[in-house]
Amino acid sequence: MDTESTYSGYSYYSSHSKKSHRQGERTRERHKSPRNKDGRGSEKSVTIQPPTGEPLLGNDSTRTEEVQDDNWGETTTAITGTSEHSISQEDIARISKDMEDSVGLDCKRYLGLTVASFLGLLVFLTPIAFILLPPILWRDELEPCGTICEGLFISMAFKLLILLIGTWALFFRKRRADMPRVFVFRALLLVLIFLFVVSYWLFYGVRILDSRDRNYQGIVQYAVSLVDALLFIHYLAIVLLELRQLQPMFTLQVVRSTDGESRFYSLGHLSIQRAALVVLENYYKDFTIYNPNLLTASKFRAAKHMAGLKVYNVDGPSNNATGQSRAMIAAAARRRDSSHNELYYEEAEHERRVKKRKARLVVAVEEAFIHIQRLQAEEQQKAPGEVMDPREAAQAIFPSMARALQKYLRITRQQNYHSMESILQHLAFCITNGMTPKAFLERYLSAGPTLQYDKDRWLSTQWRLVSDEAVTNGLRDGIVFVLKCLDFSLVVNVKKIPFIILSEEFIDPKSHKFVLRLQSETSV
């Protein structure tokens, strides 16, 4: 036991720390446990991985307080002196699967980019080759072509430039995500362009190269017609890839499975996989960040409620597990009448403590910012070399508010998402831009969207799309698909926007006029 120590700080997997005292037994029994069908172990181990940022006040002073926080067990991790990390066969299998998936995605990405680049070069070099091949192969046999051909050359050059810019703007954009399937319309356009260019080459080879056509003006017009057709195909691509999806046709209800938070989005004609991409892009900016620590209180309450029940068999020992389970359920139902009172008082006490610590935090931050204003007034009288930068000013006032901020983050279970380094950066940012204490506290008083936090706090970087239909199919009324990540899932329900009938009703302006008749007895 002399090699063991208790580390109190912000752990990435703090919600699993209650099981840390059983890791030794599970490690010894892991070699004896039966394997699943896919070759992975049935036991799951918890990898202890502290965040990259420095924990907020993770020193000895916070661990020796007389009054500990109620959730100290959730933010405490036991680390032995021999190893700080543990890994199971399931983790190894997951890592290998992720590596295989990444290799497959990279191959698919580079293959698609190679095919598109080759086809683009073929498209832009084909009209130029149509014009250059006859003068190279049978220059002396060609009929002279003067001003008309020169005008066609200028026209084709500008059309190729417009086509090049339009193709770059439409197709050569940075990929936002890796799709599980190909984009159907884009693949159809590539096939159409390939067949179109091949048919032009076949006609050019049979009717011009084999017969050595002498009409050079006709050859140039043939190349210009190819460029015109390519411009029309580019217009078709804009309609199919961009304009078709602009008009809203469906409403998507997105519900997070853990806490039930939901949002509604309106989309046009999209495939299921592209609709899933739009949902995920909006999820990171609209949904509050997922905090698994908020769910541990209800689980602990249910476990505590069932732990107080015990079944005794007066008839002697037996293996009737079903009867014992029924007895436990019946006893829990009888105790359910008083459990709501416990929940009410627990929530009331928690709200009281949150308000108390919020008030302390607000006062501490306001005093710190007043101190900053005083320092700024004093530094205006100093020499330029003696003035502190915003980073130094943030480090100077941070200790005065650190304790109150730490207690508030711990009672609201946000300690995993705010490291000391991130708080200092935010404080320096607020000082640089002259923000008020309320602007500084807004990030910590309420949970913000996922994009507000560091990427290592998101807990969701890779998603799996689960659907009963092919992901390349378009959206329609009643479709339900699920986006799953490691800790939670997003359930998406598709509803078609109803057809609205508007009728017009004309009101004669003269109907609003009235006559006021006054009498001697009428008081106005």
UniProtKB/Swiss-Prot annotation:
Biased composition regions of type Polar residues, renumbered to the chain: 73-85
Mutation effect (residue 153 to S): In NTD; uncertain significance
Distribution of this protein across tissues and organs: According to PubMed:11956595, ubiquitously expressed. According to PubMed:12011995, expressed specifically in testis and ovary.
Disorder: Neural tube defects: Congenital malformations of the central nervous system and adjacent structures related to defective neural tube closure during the first trimester of pregnancy. Failure of neural tube closure can occur at any level of the embryonic axis. Common NTD forms include anencephaly, myelomeningocele and spina bifida, which result from the failure of fusion in the cranial and spinal region of the neural tube. NTDs have a multifactorial etiology encompassing both genetic and environmental components.
Residues passing through the membrane, by range: 118-138, 152-172, 183-203, 223-243
Regions of compositional bias (Low complexity) in chain numbering: 1-15
Domain of life: Eukaryota
Oligomeric form and interacting partners: Heterodimer with VANGL2. Interacts through its C-terminal region with the N-terminal half of DVL1, DVL2 and DVL3. The PDZ domain of DVL1, DVL2 and DVL3 is required for the interaction.
Region (Disordered): 1-85
Membrane topology summary: Multi-pass membrane protein
One Pfam family in the UniProt entry: Strabismus
Main location as per UniProt: membrane
Entry similarity comment: Belongs to the Vang family.
Any one Gene Ontology BP term: mucociliary clearance
Official protein name in the record: Vang-like protein 1
Topological domain spans for side Extracellular: 139-151, 204-222
